[in-house]
């Protein structure tokens, strides 16, 4: 499975909706799909499944607001 699809699969599991796959520009926090607990879960899953460590200092909610932005941020950290 390609990197992009892996990230979207993780997001779909955490948000419990396929809307994140259908609309990769959806505002995850504004729509209530991600909160602080789900964000922690997301970062743990990213590290576990993709072997990418996201330093807390690198996590800026504004830069991680949509699935597309998350993919871009993770690509930069690979």
From Swiss-Prot:
Residues with PTM O-(pantetheine 4'-phosphoryl)serine: 36
GO molecular function, one term: D-alanyl carrier activity
Gene Ontology biological process: cell wall organization; lipoteichoic acid biosynthetic process
Subcellular location: Cytoplasm
Associated pathway: Cell wall biogenesis; lipoteichoic acid biosynthesis
Gene3D superfamilies referenced in this protein's UniProt entry, alphabetically: ACP-like
Domain Carrier residue range list: 1-78
Function: Carrier protein involved in the D-alanylation of lipoteichoic acid (LTA). The loading of thioester-linked D-alanine onto DltC is catalyzed by D-alanine--D-alanyl carrier protein ligase DltA. The DltC-carried D-alanyl group is further transferred to cell membrane phosphatidylglycerol (PG) by forming an ester bond, probably catalyzed by DltD. D-alanylation of LTA plays an important role in modulating the properties of the cell wall in Gram-positive bacteria, influencing the net charge of the cell wall.
Name by which UniProt lists this protein: D-alanyl carrier protein
Source species: Listeria innocua serovar 6a (strain ATCC BAA-680 / CLIP 11262)
């Amino acid at each position: 499975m390609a990197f992009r699809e892996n990230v979207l699969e993780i997001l779909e599991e955490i948000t419990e909706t396929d809307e994140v796959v259908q609309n990769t520009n959806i505002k995850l926090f504004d729509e209530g799909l991600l909160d602080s607990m789900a964000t922690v879960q997301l970062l743990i899953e990213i590290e576990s499944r993709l072997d990418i460590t996201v330093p807390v200092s690198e996590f800026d909610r504004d830069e991680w607001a949509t699935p597309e932005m998350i993919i871009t941020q993770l690509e930069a950290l690979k």
